[in-house]
Amino acid sequence: MKSFSMRLMHLGLKVFYIGETNTPSVNHNDLLIVGSGSGETLSLVSITEKAKKLGVKMVLFTIDDLSTLAKQASRIIKISAPSPKLQKSNNLHSIQPMGSLFEQSLLITFETIVVLLMERLGLDSEMIFKNHANLESVSYTHLRAHETTNY
């Protein structure tokens, strides 16, 4: 979701990521974009319930179009992917752990939307690169060997 927010910002759209300190209040003119494989993620259910009371429209990207989040959504984009939480809902299987295939499918879907928006807005890669960060911090992951499980 964060990478999609960043791409939308690159397109020149006014975008905020829920939970960041610089995110302003929402209103009925805003669109909330939510991704949840199961459609039952409790923190998202809480956020979307409040957003709906404020008149915010929501687009949901999910595996389960009958979920709690789906019932609150203005629009649903169903993504076919296996999920250990939703084995009853489809016969799809993956050797990847947990919701990996949903997350990968979500990223590809978002990148496709970005390309379509670029076409609609008359933008190309060079134009949107001008909105890319030019001051970046170092991001890294630190894993301590003695804190890992030996397999």
What are these regions (language model features)?
Residues 2-108:
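Glycine-rich phosphate-binding loops that contact phosphosugars or nucleotide phosphates
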Residues 106, 110-111, 130-131:
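Charge-rich intrinsically disordered tails and low-complexity stretches
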Residues 140-148:
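Conserved small/polar residues in nucleotide/adenosyl-binding loops
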Residues 119-139:
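A short, charged, Gly/Pro-tolerant segment at domain boundaries
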Residues 111-119:
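Short glycine/serine- and small hydrophobic-enriched flexible loop segments
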Residues 103, 111, 147:
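Acidic-residue sensor for enzyme active/binding pockets
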